[in-house]
């Protein structure tokens, strides 16, 4: 086992929803691949014992992909359980005993951020945070710039930055982290990937469903906090970053941070927020809620490559389709011969199926001198054999590969950009279910308009 590989996995919140839906299925997948062979220690305050946690693990697997008999048998061999409160130091003393000689444990905090400080401090006090230990935390990394800085101070008090793993499972999606490879490995593409040739970039993350019973959580977040500040900024970083000088994790993360440092902080004229009609009647939602379920934003990246190129992001719930994609619209060709020639574009779809397509002009065979836009599909796959995003990020976290994870400076720069427009800093507009957001969002529209995603033959 290498010095970067952890020698024990501890996950707090072992009886919770995240463990049930994501962690146990990821553990089984890792065991099947041969990438996990260390003690797995669950910690929670539920009055459970090991047998009941094992039953919970089996039930999780039955409802999320199925039980692999051999892999589940191995999970049972590796699994331990400590029942106790996070405020009780005795819980952590028991954890220390259970860890035994482990010197590089990974502590996964699958718990609310309000408990992070207590758990991290007790880990250190009980001797569970030796120099080789690491701590894994889930997004959200704070609620704004001030809380993100406070959270980082808590973590850095007992762990060095190299030992802090900030997980955003979205980066585990293969199409997201393959964007840079596509950019720099294709000589047809990279030379035009700059302000000289790109007119604008648009990112869409649309969902055709609502809050799905998560109203109480969603009403504390909203679209900007929930997906734009993290998921979509990560996509943007991969699109806009410079090719790193080396392929090590720090070189790649350095370039991503440079992108965020180049983005102007958002102002009121750069954002339109919306809320779908009926949101305030959802369970757990305040009847006077000012939380957005839709947002459209315009960004400017003041780097040499992207100076003057507007970048548009929109995301929301109960929109016409469920789809996440990027479209880069190239500058319009000179109108010398054919006045109706439209700008070319590159479309990079992340979900529901990964797809790369190019929009080109061709001459209409039915009308002389008239062109039409056609789309060439360069790559398409449904990702049936693709590793689950949680499995990917958890595997990398345990192996010590930090490439996909947000660094302290990245997190704080992302919050800096959105901080001025959080909460009720801008007006909230109502929109109808199945629409592309409120009418005022037309004020934040790319040149030439949005290219709406087409899924299953319709964009509605």
Where are these regions (language model features)?
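Secretory/organelle targeting and membrane-embedding segments
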Residues: 1-136, 141-460
